[in-house]
Amino acid sequence: MRGSGPRGAGRRRTQGRGGGGDTPRVPASLAGCYSAPLKGPLWTCLLLCAALRTLLASPSNEVNLLDSRTVLGDLGWIAFPKNGWEEIGEVDENYAPIHTYQVCKVMEQNQNNWLLTSWISNEGASRIFIELKFTLRDCNSLPGGLGTCKETFNMYYFESDDENGRNIKDNQYIKIDTIAADESFTELDLGDRVMKLNTEVRDVGPLSKKGFYLAFQDVGACIALVSVRVYYKKCPSVVRHLAVFPDTITGADSSQLLEVSGSCVNHSVTDDPPKMHCSAEGEWLVPIGKCMCKAGYEEKNGTCQVCRPGFFKASPHSQTCSKCPPHSYTHEEASTSCVCEKDYFRRESDPPTMACTRPPSAPRNAISNVNETSVFLEWIPPADTGGGKDVSYYILCKKCNSHAGVCEECGGHVRYLPQQIGLKNTSVMMADPLAHTNYTFEIEAVNGVSDLSPGTRQYVSVNVTTNQAAPSPVTNVKKGKIAKNSISLSWQEPDRPNGIILEYEIKYFEKDQETSYTIIKSKETTITAEGLKPASVYVFQIRARTAAGYGVFSRRFEFETTPVFGASNDQSQIPIIGVSVTVGVILLAVMIGFLLSGSCCECGCGRASSLCAVAHPSLIWRCGYSKAKQDPEEEKMHFHNGHIKLPGVRTYIDPHTYEDPTQAVHEFGKEIEASCITIERVIGAGEFGEVCSGRLKLPGKRELPVATKTLKVGYTEKQRRDFLSEASIMGQFDHPNIIHLEGVVTKSKPVMIVTEYMENGSLDTFLKKNDGQFTVIQLVGMLRGIAAGMKYLSDMGYVHRDLAARNILINSNLVCKVSDFGLSRVLEDDPEAAYTTRGGKIPIRWTAPEAIAFRKFTSASDVWSYGIVMWEVVSYGERPYWEMTNQDVIKAVEEGYRLPSPMDCPAALYQLMLDCWQKDRNSRPKFDDIVNMLDKLIRNPSSLKTLVNASSRVSTLLAEHGSLGSGAYRSVGEWLEATKMGRYTEIFMENGYSSMDAVAQVTLE
């Protein structure tokens, strides 16, 4: 801070002892000093007291150049004139000298008393501070001195490189400031033994020479200079971010920041060059950069200490030493990595922090499934994965000669779906195996270190013998006669017919118009495609069919028709064209007459045959009741079960009324070529075979994700009918909340049903995995979708019979869709009273009581099941009635008990559940009513905030249906835990049901 003196003299005032509220009292032991006259002992005693009270330590960021309190010998200061400033030399209680100067020439005019210090080295500092501690007498307290007494004195300095250059004239000194006292003492202070000590600080800079002198000028004050301290400020040495910053003298300017570079401590390296800034006040500011302990060392208490054995640090960027990862060790200090144990490995690309692993053991329990066109393999992952998660599988196919006992690798004739190497799934399909061939498939589990292990391969073998397979592709196709409107082709049998060729299927289309193609079938190896455009390129593909099914199409062959010839040739075609037109007209007339005569009945023209019976009663005996293919876009009035259905009203048709299920499936479903489907992985097992996910790419359409159900090998005719019936049922439905049938594959093996793919799988499993993750509105949205789908089925006259959360599929957008339409159900007299299907038992806990007792399945019984589904959704997939037996469930429902409300269930939803569980089926709501109710709840979310209270849950908890005999359970809590209802214990206790006798009395009332 700049003062009034020249060359940057600064003024700082620090109110110390004697200033403000910090006025010390003179000790009683020194009270006698104040009774003496002003001169002599009194003044000396006073100065001693002041000196004894000011021996204080300096701050760590201040370096003293001079402190008169600590000088043991003579100060060497000079006073002139000699009768001016007077040195008082005393010692303290430790016999240390006390240097004090006083002057009190207040009665004489024109005082000019100087006190000069010895030469003071600045030690390289360009800015220094002077701290003065002094006392001053109040002029008003001195009788007779008002005209000559002053209450200030002056301080000067003079720079010099010479420590012996004290012969300085007064005018050569540079004034720093005029010093005034904040407080002065009076005679009263002496009487009260109070001493008022002033502290003033001034700064000077910038300095340019090695040292300087100070001078104090008295002009007529009564003053005692108790101590003089001269110092400079520095930023003290410090360790920050593992960098050492040395003592740094502050700059000359009070606002200057000096940038200082740090040096890294031992065993550390530079990350970003460490820097800090030293402020004028001696404080470190603005740290930049840092050092890091090098590899093998960690930071502790500002130093880098070595990593102990068993620990390592791979990089300076790591913070601390880490314990060696699993299956590795180190016995050295300062380790940067750990060594793998015997038989364990780490890849070069693996970081040192990764655990050492070993190759996995062999896969387990491999099984095979063989059909005419492929081999399916499935297995369980290895018991020992080697410690890693990167297990994949490699399939090695060997073709074996059973007589010679020799095996060779299969080569390229076998295709692996999805792949042979790097397989992540535990299943694979091999396509195009040879018929009647012995294969050995070696399934090897590998991971990232398998190549590093010198040990033997770990694999499981599966031996397979194929039966008759579909034919291999046709490879050799030759063109025959080519005209402007026709192309003749011939070809050879496939290299591997794998049986008797029944026929060939030829597919052709104009180039670049693949979506519009024509199919020709031929029992010979030659065909002629007619009706083609002149001068056009056509693409042909051929495949063969045996009893095992169709093979794959051949590669594409391109042939071009000849161009149209000249005018004469065109004229020659006129008679032919005329004949063709005439023949066409005749054929058209014959067909019209044929239809009008009612002969279509004899040809089995499908639903139109029932119209024939109306128009031509005499033909009824010939037509019978027949169902055949009809254009799905065509809407006609037809008979069904004795009722007339008007055009535009869709009604469910039971596919079992068809003599041939293939006819039904082709009427309601679309045939898809197997080559359009890519199987990716097995996702489950259905009633009739495996369920897989894959991709469907139809010509001219975008690729779709699909799910496929396959008909297992060795199926019976009844199984085939039931399998196709499910597709026939599904194909009749078109609703966003009903699973969509994409098509069927019936012309090749395996027979497949292709549906849309639902990413999240079954609803019950999905809810269990995401327990508590959805809002009430989201749950109601799911229920609304299910209800909308069931309303659609009800409107079509279809009764589902097995509505449960497990039969609801949910996609990635949380859209729920009703599925599982293919089960036939038979009521058996088993102790569980469950419906048995070929896929297993369906528990009766979802089934309405009238359906259990009288086999009355209606839309109303589906509504009961829907209420159970609501309970499953709100409880996030809990099992209805928990662990109660089916007989207990039947008894409880018949006696009027119902499932309790799930926890935190909105009252409106639980009331809807109870409505669905009305014993009288006519009292239950229709699905149309349910959809409307849920729509209202969604539009008014506040109506869902009212929850079912605790006491109402107790009344529906099926108390007496858990063997409540007094000896069965010792406490209510034990009974609730046994029935999987332990979370309701607190509710029972709060409502007074603390004993088994009390629980046994629970009724609906």
From Swiss-Prot:
| Residue span of region Disordered | 1-24
Please provide one cellular component term from the Gene Ontology annotations of this protein: plasma membrane
Q: What is the lineage of its organism?
A: Eukaryota, Metazoa, Chordata, Craniata, Vertebrata
Q: Report domain Protein kinase positions.
A: 677-938
Superkingdom, taxonomy of origin: Eukaryota
Query: Mind telling me which residue stretches traverse the membrane in this protein?
Result: 576-596
Q: Which UniProt keywords apply?
A: ATP-binding, Cell membrane, Cell projection, Glycoprotein, Kinase, Membrane, Neurogenesis, Nucleotide-binding, Phosphoprotein, Receptor, Repeat, Signal, Transferase, Transmembrane, Transmembrane helix, Tyrosine-protein kinase
Tell me the protein's name: Ephrin type-A receptor 5
